[in-house]
């Protein structure tokens, strides 16, 4: 009541002409002024207490009546749209009487309904089980929701260490810090005492995890005494070519023989130099290198044994990468003294193989020169005709 008196004094301090013009019309048209004598002026038929109107609601109620009188067929949504635009266009000075009336209604509402508390309707949730009943108070519904979330938090807390333990077998010991960060424990005040023992049991132990991870990896690898000897690891390195250029030294070299035996003893099938030279042709002159003794090289030129040792060694390694295809084996079975036609065809094959081996060592875009004499002659010829009239087409 004291606040109402203060508001009335504030109204009396305003200019009298302002009260006579807008506020007089406002009080005359105000629907609330007629019903304020009723003690249930803000209650609905079902007993629900309505909220006090704000300034826009007070103004829109008056203006809505005017619009409905002028155009009764206008839709309610269209009226609301127009009223919203007009309210935004109003000046602050024009809104003052409606703001004052809304404040007066708010104070009267507080005096008539002191126990009123604004409780907006909660939107229905998608999960019907989590939806509280309509008659339940907000405090009880909040407590029920809190109790419903409790088991879910415990389950999440139990799942996190289980998932970490399953992933610990594949993870390295250095990943233990990441596993710790993945564990999130949310505890309510009433669950802290109950969950202390569980948390102590589920808390990750860095030392134990490191010790557990090592045996998990140890069954995959043999112990240090059972690991592969260093000589068996040499099978992954490139096989050495004997340094001596003679055939006799290649067969008599103890180092080369021991290397090839270790390769065959490794338990996997590897082509050794003994398999290469198994089908040797009749003894060649001593000036031939070991790579020259292979059949493709011997057939490349009939009787000519010239060629550097480095190029022959590269050809030998290329033959290893080809895995001795059937064509190479058929070429090996030909005698050294074959006809000129056979030597010519094998020499062409040898040139193609050498060009492929050289191209594989470089870039994919380095193409060898395959120009034949006829092609080079065509390229070198005159491209422009001497007589320009020959280039003119006649139809």
Curated annotation (Swiss-Prot):
Null mutant phenotype: Mice die at birth with numerous morphological abnormalities. Incomplete separation of the heart ventricles with fused aorta and pulmonary arteries. Skeletal malformations including hypoplastic sternebrae, unfused vertebral bodies and hypomineralized skull. All mice have microphthalmia and open eyelids, with 50% of mice exhibiting omphalocele, and 40% exhibiting cleft palate, cleft lips and a tail kink. Sox11 and Sox4 double knockout mice die in utero at 10.5 dpc.
Annotated region (Required for transcriptional activation activity and synergistic coactivation of transcriptional activity with POU3F2), positions in chain: 363-395
Stretches assigned to coiled coil: none
Positions of the DNA-binding region: 49-117
Bias (Low complexity) ranges: 158-174, 289-309
Keyword GTP-binding: no
Record bears the keyword Nucleus: yes
The protein's name in its UniProt record: Transcription factor SOX-11
């Amino acid at each position: 009541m004291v606040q109402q008196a203060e508001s009335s004094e504030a109204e009396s301090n305003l200019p009298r002409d302002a009260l006579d013009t807008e506020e007089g019309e406002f009080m005359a048209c105000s629907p609330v002024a007629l019903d304020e004598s009723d003690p249930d002026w803000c209650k609905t038929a079902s007993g629900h207490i309505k909220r006090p109107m704000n300034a826009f609601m007070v103004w829109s109620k008056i203006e809505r009546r005017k619009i409905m009188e002028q155009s009764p067929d206008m839709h309610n949504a269209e009226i609301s749209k127009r009223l919203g635009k007009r309210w935004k266009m109003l000046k602050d000075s024009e809104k003052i009487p409606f703001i004052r009336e809304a404040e007066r209604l708010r104070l009267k509402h507080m005096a008539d309904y002191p126990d009123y508390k604004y409780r907006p309707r909660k939107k229905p949730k998608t999960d019907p089980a989590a939806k509280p009943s309509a008659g339940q108070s907000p405090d009880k519904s909040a407590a029920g929701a809190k109790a419903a979330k409790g088991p879910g938090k415990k389950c999440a807390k139990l799942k996190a260490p289980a998932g970490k333990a399953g992933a610990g077998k594949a993870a390295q010991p250095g990943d233990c810090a990441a596993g710790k960060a993945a564990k999130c424990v949310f505890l309510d005040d009433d669950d802290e005492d109950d969950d202390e023992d569980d948390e102590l049991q589920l808390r990750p132990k860095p030392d134990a995890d490191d010790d557990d991870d090592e045996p998990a990896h140890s069954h995959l690898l043999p112990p240090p005494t059972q690991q592969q000897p260093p000589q068996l690891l040499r099978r992954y390195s490139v096989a050495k070519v004997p340094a001596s250029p003679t055939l006799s030294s290649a067969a008599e070299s103890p180092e080369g023989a021991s290397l090839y035996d270790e390769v065959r003893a490794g338990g996997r099938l590897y082509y050794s130099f003994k398999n290469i030279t198994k089908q040797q042709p009749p003894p060649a002159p001593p000036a031939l290198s070991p790579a020259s003794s292979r059949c493709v090289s011997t057939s490349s030129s009939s009787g000519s044994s010239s060629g550097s040792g480095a190029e022959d060694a590269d050809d030998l390694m290329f033959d290893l990468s080809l895995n001795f295809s059937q064509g190479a084996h058929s070429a090996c079975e030909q005698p050294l003294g074959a006809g000129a036609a056979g030597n010519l065809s094998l020499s062409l094959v040898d040139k193609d193989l050498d060009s492929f081996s050289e191209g594989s060592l470089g870039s994919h875009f380095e193409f060898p020169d395959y120009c034949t004499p006829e092609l080079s002659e065509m390229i070198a010829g005159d491209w422009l005709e001497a007589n320009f009239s020959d280039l003119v087409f006649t139809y």
